[in-house]
């Protein structure tokens, strides 16, 4: 009985060894075959592998071209937007320059207005300028006719004054003498002239403050 068990164990052990040897030999054979196939593929590639690699390269190049086209279109769009922004900024800048030019064109008028203002408020600071009359050019005939006409008018006025003087009565002479005396008295009394000059000075300094006064005539009865 013991011998039978011992023989069975030996048979099992031998069988395991043979199985392991066979499996290891099969694995080595498979690995050698795969290595040979890979080497053959590397040396002599097949048509299918060539097509697959070529197609992959074509697809990759197409994708790169599409990406480059898309990036270029985006860049062109950005450049267009920047140009539009620049043109809008230029328009605003030109408007500002036009407004500044208009202001400087109107500025001399403003200075002229300011210069005229103090002249109105301070009339005594005005510079006395000699007015040069513009003499028109006349012919000799026109000058002779104008001289004759002036002489005739002077003669007529002198004759009219002489006739008026001859027609004056004694009452009118007395009135004239009385008026002359009154005028001489007012000329000696200088206070009204001073008041008149002061009022004119205030009126020139403050032309907007002009009180409305009612003039009451003063009549002196004799």
Swiss-Prot record:
UniProt keyword Membrane present: no
Tissue: Mammary gland specific. Secreted in milk.
Keyword Repeat: yes
Sequence repeats: 76-140, 158-222
Annotated compartments: Secreted
GO MF annotations in UniProt: protein homodimerization activity; zymogen binding
Pfam families per record: Casein
Sites of Phosphoserine modification: 23-25, 28, 46, 71-73, 76, 144, 146, 150, 158
Gene Ontology biological process terms from the UniProt entry: defense response to bacterium; response to 11-deoxycorticosterone; response to dehydroepiandrosterone; response to estradiol; response to growth hormone; response to progesterone
Residues making up the signal peptide according to the UniProt record: 1-15
InterPro entries: Alpha-s2_casein (IPR011175), Casein (IPR001588), Casein_CS (IPR031305)
UniProt keyword annotations, A-Z: Antibiotic, Antimicrobial, Milk protein, Phosphoprotein, Repeat, Secreted, Signal
PROSITE patterns to which the protein is assigned, alphabetical: CASEIN_ALPHA_BETA
Domain of life according to the entry: Eukaryota
Function: Important role in the capacity of milk to transport calcium phosphate.
PANTHER family associated with the record: ALPHA-S2-CASEIN-LIKE B
Family that this chain belongs to: Belongs to the alpha-casein family.
Protein name: Alpha-S2-casein
Organism name: Bos taurus
Taxonomic placement: Eukaryota, Metazoa, Chordata, Craniata, Vertebrata
Gene this protein is translated from: CSN1S2
